Amino acid sequence: MSERIKTAALRDFSVSLCRAAGLSADDAALLTDSILFAECRGVTSHGLLRLPQYIARLRSGATASNASMPFTMESGGTARLDAQNGLGQLAGRKASDKAEELAAEYGVSFVAVANSNHFGTGAWYAIPAARRGFFAFNISSAASAMAPHGAAQPLLGTDPVGLALPRGEGKAPLALDMALSTAARGKIRYAALNGTPIPETWGLDAHGAPTTDAAAVLDGGTLLPAGGAKGSGLAIFIELLCAVLTGSGALGGTGLLSDLSRPAGTGHIFGCVDIKRFLPLKTFEALCEESLSRVTSLTPSQPGGEILLPGEPEERRAAESAANGVPVAPALRDTLNALAEELGCAARI
């Protein structure tokens, strides 16, 4: 059974491990913030589970621990950052801050990031920008895991999309953070572990046939895009923007986080729109609330059901985590404590 651990204790532990792996105090705190943002919101696939992978890449040199990440181009509302194979979260934060800065000056911004790594959850960047009055978006390339529509082999990444806009005082921004596969790879792994069948729409086996066997999807098979041709088409566009436009490489060239033999070569795009350039922010927020109330006031499709807006389930989990601590599975806890011992770090959870 998972034991709940206070966020402050998890933060101290994660920072200690990151410092032991060679990160500066500031960089360790930033990476930890990204990890706990995801963990506290229930997005466990991008939370503490990722910490051993990030540290393994840092220790092996697959990810650079001291990249300076210069901006190699700035023109009007656009910019390009070379992450120099540094941590994706550090590059992403620097780029998203630049996107806000440029949007404040020019009204809109478009910032490309080349030669990066896995950047965590898109909402971690978009929500703070939305709180400051911007519509914010981000997209990223990812390692090949998903077949293009009609194909039997993986080529596309799950290519996450993050969006957020402000809703006014006292309300969390409306936020959408999603990958473009029908189901997350983590869900399929969980089904395989428990021997439970999956819907045929989730993946193909190694022969290109739809399957309800989760293990067959993972063993030489492929994930399928959400919405068939629609999700596939959107993923192709994201790959061309994030891989090709940024200068990171060609479609399908992004490396796996677990592959310590090479740089990941991940590309990202960050952008912001300064809402008050179009209409007063308060007016925008009021009209959004009126519009969203029309959604939530509809009759639920299931008796006793509830209509939730994008990001609301995660905000509820975050509030629960803040009040009661974060549930950490025993196996993950053991893994993290073993890693701490290996690093010569005294911290434990």
Feature roles, as predicted:
Residues H46-E100:
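Active-site cofactor/substrate anionic-group-binding motifs, chiefly glycine-
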Residues V15-D26, D33-T44, A56-T63, E101-E105, ...:
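Generic secondary-structure signature for well-ordered alpha-helical cores
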Residues M146-A216:
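Phosphate/diphosphate-binding glycine-rich loops and adjacent basic-rich segments that engage nucleotide
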Residues E3-T7, S24-G47, T63-E74, S261-G265, ...:
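N-terminal glycine-rich anion-binding loops that anchor highly charged ligand groups
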Residues R185-A250, S258-P263:
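Small-residue-enriched flexible segments
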Residues R4-K6, L10-F13, A20, A250-I349:
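Catalytic-core signal marking the mid-to-C-terminal active-site face
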Residues T78-G168, A175:
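A generic, well-ordered mixed alpha/beta core segment in the N-terminal half of proteins
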